[in-house]
Amino acid sequence: MEQVNKSTFSDVLEYVRMSRRQNKLKREIADNEKKIRDNQKRVLLLDNLSDYIKPGMSIDEVQAIIANMRTDYEERVDDHIIKNAELSKERKDLSAKLKAMSSSK
């Protein structure tokens, strides 16, 4: 009987742990989506900025700086998209495990 109680208690603790992780993943996904939007806006800003640069402003240097900044922001967007996909997959796996645990009781 004591073994059954330990097993049940352990299952409950595992269920709570996975539920908390699932909620944390939801928050991280939302945070990543915000970062993606922010960096996409920065890319657009830099595109617009390059339209306003006038020829009298050492154009080659300014364009090189803008190109470097744009590349950096695009890489950040890509990194956040990849991280978001990984988090979504983990969240999906946890949802399936939680569903299986709750239906087996």
Curated annotation (Swiss-Prot):
SS bond partners: none
- Subcellular localization, as worded in the UniProt entry: Cytoplasm
Residues that span the membrane, as ranges = none
Q: What superkingdom heads the lineage? A: Bacteria
Q: Which GO terms describe its cellular component?
A: cytosol
On whether Oxidoreductase is a keyword of this UniProt record, the answer is no
Which chain positions lie within coiled-coil regions?
15-42, 70-104
What keywords is this UniProt entry annotated with? Coiled coil, Cytoplasm
* Primary location recorded for the protein, binned into one broad class: cytoplasm
Assigned protein family: Belongs to the pole-localizer TmaR family.
Q: What does this protein do?
A: Pole-localizer protein involved in the regulation of several cellular processes.
NCBIfam families from the xrefs?
PRK05423.1, PTS_reg_TmaR
- Name assigned to this protein: Pole-localizer protein TmaR
Organism equals: Aeromonas salmonicida (strain A449)
